[in-house]
């Protein structure tokens, strides 16, 4: 057929010059569509003689295949070029560090509990635990707390309910960790040197009190244990905990489970609404302590004629507030992520005594 070479050259030239897939599709329809130029040429084969058709048919089919191949190749080239442009526009430096993911932090109470445990462990103390729901005996009777004591009042203590007709004393949410003393003495006897950190519960709620808080109990029993040992242990603890030398002051006080009993103050200064421990001329009450009452020893199965010892109890939340400048106890349990991110600790951050600082 006349003009096939020109037809071939024209379409290949136009296909090669297409700048986008839309233009390329227009060329495909114009060349190979139902009314396309090459398609119309194919229809003319029916008007030819067999001899002419034998020559023109293969030539037209070859042209059609070549144009189809050129369109496919051009389409692939345009796709590659578009991808290159996109990659340039969306280029990323894969050597840059990834954006850090938000991770949780260690709650100040958990951190301080670890610090307290580590310091006392360094002095030879082990950790003891007990149930948070206690019997009347372990929470009060065994600790020499009489039936008329104000601590037993429902306004101070959370009581559970017994079934109707059950006249046994109701269980309580323990008001202190002191019951662990009795349970440990019953099971392990004396001598002993333990601390008992854990949750305790009292019906109170204000800036410095919450219905649930954390306390650590300390108990040392031996044949020659004295108040002098108690003073040394507490001064060593506070100096290690606050990182400065801390002086203590003992004031005589009454607690049913110790005799004699003492409230312990630590040296501090009050400046601009902040408390600085270990300096100044002021004193801050920090815990209750004393020599374990003989009746408490007997309740735990210990002979008070053979063994004696001291005990103390302090609030973990309170010393956390002092050390880390936290103004309101209620914030510890408000589940405020902003507060937790500010006062929390990294998951791999060890207590200072573990790290050797």
Curated annotation (Swiss-Prot):
Residue numbers binding Mg(2+): 259
Cofactor dependency: Mg(2+)
Catalytic activity: tRNA(Phe) + L-phenylalanine + ATP = L-phenylalanyl-tRNA(Phe) + AMP + diphosphate + H(+)
GO molecular function, one term: tRNA binding
Signal peptide location: none
Cofactor details (free text): Binds 2 magnesium ions per tetramer.
InterPro entries: aa-tRNA-synth_II, aa-tRNA-synth_II/BPL/LPL, Phe-tRNA-synth_IIc_asu, Phe-tRNA_ligase_II_N, Phe_tRNA_ligase_alpha1_bac, Phenylalanyl-tRNA_Synthase, tRNA-bd_arm
Enzyme Commission code(s) on record: 6.1.1.20
Record-given protein name: Phenylalanine--tRNA ligase alpha subunit
């Amino acid at each position: 057929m006349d003009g096939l070479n020109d037809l071939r050259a024209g379409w290949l030239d136009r296909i090669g010059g297409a700048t986008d897939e839309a233009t390329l599709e227009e060329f495909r329809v114009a060349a190979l569509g139902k009314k396309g130029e090459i398609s119309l040429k194919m229809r003319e084969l029916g008007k030819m003689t067999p001899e002419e058709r034998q020559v023109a048919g293969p030539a037209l089919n070859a042209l059609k295949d070549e144009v189809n191949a050129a369109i496919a190749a051009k389409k692939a080239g345009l796709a590659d070029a578009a991808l290159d442009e996109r990659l340039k526009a969306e280029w990323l430096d894969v050597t840059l560090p990834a954006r850090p993911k938000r991770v949780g932090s260690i709650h100040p109470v958990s951190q301080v509990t670890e610090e307290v445990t580590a310091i006392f462990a360094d002095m030879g103390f082990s950790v003891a635990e007990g149930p948070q729901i206690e019997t009347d005996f372990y929470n009060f009777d065994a600790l020499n707390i009489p039936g008329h004591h104000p601590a037993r009042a429902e306004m101070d203590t959370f009581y559970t309910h017994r079934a109707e007709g059950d006249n046994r004393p109701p269980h309580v949410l323990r008001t202190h960790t002191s019951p662990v003393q009795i349970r440990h003495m019953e099971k392990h006897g004396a001598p002993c040197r333990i601390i008992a950190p854990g949750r305790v519960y009292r019906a109170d709620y204000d800036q410095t009190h919450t219905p649930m808080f954390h306390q650590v109990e300390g108990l040392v029993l031996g044949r020659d244990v004295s108040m002098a040992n108690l003073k040394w242990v507490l001064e060593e603890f506070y100096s290690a905990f606050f990182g400065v030398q801390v002086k203590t002051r003992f004031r005589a006080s009454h607690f049913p489970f110790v005799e004699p009993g003492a409230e312990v103050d630590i040296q501090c200064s009050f400046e601009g609404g902040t408390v600085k421990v270990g300096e100044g001329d002021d004193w801050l009450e920090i815990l209750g302590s004393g020599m374990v009452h003989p009746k408490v020893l007997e309740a735990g199965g210990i002979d008070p004629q053979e063994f004696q010892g001291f005990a103390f109890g302090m609030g973990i939340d309170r010393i956390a507030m002092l050390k880390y400048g936290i103004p309101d106890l209620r914030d510890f349990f408000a589940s405020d992520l902003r507060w937790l991110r500010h006062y929390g600790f990294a998951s791999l951050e060890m207590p200072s005594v573990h790290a050797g600082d």
